[in-house]
Amino acid sequence: MSRIAKQPIVIPSDVSITLIGQMVIVKGSKGELKRLIHDSVLVKSVKSCLVFSSRINSSVKGWAQAGTARSLVNSMIHGVTVGFFKKLKLFGVGYRISINSSKNLNMSLGYSHIIEYVLPFGIFVESISQAEIIVKGINKQLVGQVAANLRAYRKSEPYKGKGIRYSNEIVRVKEAKKK
């Protein structure tokens, strides 16, 4: 049995949750998110709490899905109230990132051309400097995926430490080959 699924989610006063079959719709001050919950999970709204359980009590997979569903809905509630962000930093001579007028990113990462990245709907980027950006949004998965996609254009390499990395990421620089 999942310990996470047994914990109820307390619904904040500024969030409204609608349950339509297996669809959970969460509305808050920052926006609205929808998610389809697995068929083996039963979601109930009791007072100002959401309770998750397995439809078949003896099913281990049902309880595992209930724990996953609870975590996903909890992230949705956090997203529509506070939001999520990932901070990225660029390390390297001449590496720059800028936001153009159509809210797309232009990245100069040492290639012979400038990379233009089109932001998906619901993702916002804030530029702190030419070498730092913050990816923001209400969908945790989408914010993480966009940050990972941006990082994939030039991952930090271990010899000089050049590339794009998360603000809390530590890159261990290797020693150069000796003669």
Swiss-Prot record:
Keywords: Ribonucleoprotein, Ribosomal protein, RNA-binding, rRNA-binding. It comes from the Bacteria. Coiled coil: none annotated. One of its GO terms (cellular component) is cytosolic large ribosomal subunit. Pfam families: Ribosomal_L6. This protein binds to the 23S rRNA, and is important in its secondary structure. It is located near the subunit interface in the base of the L7/L12 stalk, and near the tRNA binding site of the peptidyltransferase center. PROSITE patterns: RIBOSOMAL_L6_1. Signal peptide: none annotated. PANTHER family: 60S/50S RIBOSOMAL PROTEIN L6/L9, LARGE RIBOSOMAL SUBUNIT PROTEIN UL6M. Part of the 50S ribosomal subunit. GO terms for biological process: cytoplasmic translation. The keyword rRNA-binding applies. InterPro entries: Ribosomal_uL6-like, Ribosomal_uL6-like_a/b-dom_sf, Ribosomal_uL6_a/b-dom, Ribosomal_uL6_bac-type, Ribosomal_uL6_CS. This is Large ribosomal subunit protein uL6. GO terms for molecular function: rRNA binding; structural constituent of ribosome. The keyword Metal-binding does not apply. Belongs to the universal ribosomal protein uL6 family. SUPFAM superfamilies: Ribosomal protein L6 (SSF56053).
